[in-house]
Amino acid sequence: MRGKSELVKPDTHNQTKGGLERDYITQWSYGIGETFSLLVPNVKGGASVPLAANEKAMEKANPMYGSIYNQLGQYWGEQPGTSGPVYVGAFVMFLFILGLFVVKGPMKWALLAATVLSVLLSWGKNFMGFTDFFLDYIPMYDKFRAVSSILVIAEFTIPLLAMLALKQIIARPQIMKEQAKAFYISFGLTGGIALLFALAPRFFFPSYVSSMEMQALQSIPADQLAPLIANLEEVRVSIFTSDAWRSFFVVSIGAVLLWLYGMGKLKSELTIGVLLLLCLVEMWNVNKRYLYDAQFVPQTVRTESFRPTETDKAILEDKTLDYRVLNLASNTFNENNTSYWHKSIGGYHAAKLRRYQEMIEEHISPEMSNLFKAVSEAGGDMAKVDASAFPVLNMLNTRYFIFPLQGGKTMPIQNPYTLGNAWFVDKVQYVNNANEEIESLHKVMPAKVAVVDKKFAEQVKPVAVSDSLRFVKLVAYEPNDLKYEVSSEKGGVVVFSEIYYPGWQAYIDGVEAPHGRADYILRAMNVPAGKHTVEFKFDPKSLHTTETIAFVALGLLAMAVLLLVAVSYTHLR
């Protein structure tokens, strides 16, 4: 999410000083118990794929629950969903623990500290005091979401210390005798724990159904729910225990090989080769769960996923320079197929503008619900639909709606109420802050009134008079260069259906002119009477500044190289 929120919300604890909200940042928090996935990958089921896809686990399933298991995921952890666990290898974890005893020097402590830090931070809302400290006092930390991703540090540090431990043992096999106690402790903390998981899974994890799943299953009658939960837990326990046994045997095989090497029974070359093969086979087996053969498809198949539908083709026949499309037939803000063919109101991007996200939550999503209901009741006849039900969608130049039909088909519906690329307004309404600005859009019609934060009062001045003959027309469009023809007898304020963003420069007849923000996300400016060409160019000053710095740095680097060559040449003579 890009940009700092200017909205003041009642729950101030949920807000950070300048980044994302705490709930949003910690939504994907790794569970404390889930951390054992470093040793046993399926400690919480693995990935959020249909449970029914696991054929081995389905051997424990009651066939009468097949349709339900198609809807339930294999993952039952605390995160909303996941593509897979964080796993470094069972034997690698054994070597990591052993490395804490046999590796000497500051490197060991640095790797241990980094590992512990990444684990604690990955817990997010499950260790909120620690997370709050980092959000409040560590620069830039509040700009990132999905705290569980910080385990990538542990995925680097754990294998590194494991390799250092193996290096020590291979170089000095007598360590196995000198550090026999450390060897047993390391085995107990890895292989021993895996064995306990396999033998007593319910002792360590009493429940195998997430709280979200329990809420979703509450609609099932109580007398049917109890046996379903019992069978579901049996299926998931089998997933967990089978992986626990696998980790136990991997650690045991690796530990036996190391012990035999330490006792002089195996040569170093053979030991290293077999251990490498063990790790390769073990990691390959786990990796193939998530990167399997069926995912590798011919390029032609991949490109066919973006083939235009009949609805797309119909919309693309409209050669108007610039307009937007709202897809109501899909998960609007979590799909990008629409954006492949059209300028979309929706689409997904992990770093979308915060202001636009706030508009989605406050206006666009509610208006989509109103629109869907109104169009359905009108049978697709937009003449029977009240435009006041979706004013923000109209100001965003939404020219077409993709509407769902039965059988997975869709149809395009043209919106006759869209305000177009730009328009004159009759009034400018100034507000004191962002809260008033976004809330005022519930009360005004953007076609007539521009809501402007008072900090843009100098850039967007009040409208003196109205003019019935005025018009604005987009005449040239490039993503970074837009030109409009503007004509009016008395001048006024024009609102442009484009996102206000720093770096855009406005020009009237080639002369730079001020512009400001209106309606929370759009651009607005005063245009004098007469016929004019208004142009917006994306030309951020920061680009020129960094370009100058880059050229200076390259010049200094070139001079340094020449000086070095000259000095070397002098010494040679």
Residue locations for each model-derived region?
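Active-site-adjacent bridging/hinge elements
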Residues: 61-73, 91, 127-138, 224-232, ...
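Contiguous transmembrane helix-bundle modules in multi-pass membrane proteins
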Residues: 103-308, 529-573
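C-terminal, active-site-flanking charged/polar segments
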Residues: 6-13, 158-161, 179-195, 276-283, ...
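Individual transmembrane alpha-helix segments
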Residues: 36-92, 236-245
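Extracytoplasmic/lumenal acceptor-recognition loop(s) of multi-pass membrane glycoenzymes
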Residues: 31, 43, 208-211, 275-306, ...
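Active-site-proximal, structured, solvent-exposed surfaces of multi-pass membrane proteins
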Residues: 94, 399, 408, 448-568, ...
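Aromatic-rich transmembrane-lumenal/periplasmic boundary elements in polytopic membrane proteins
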Residues: 1-56, 206-209
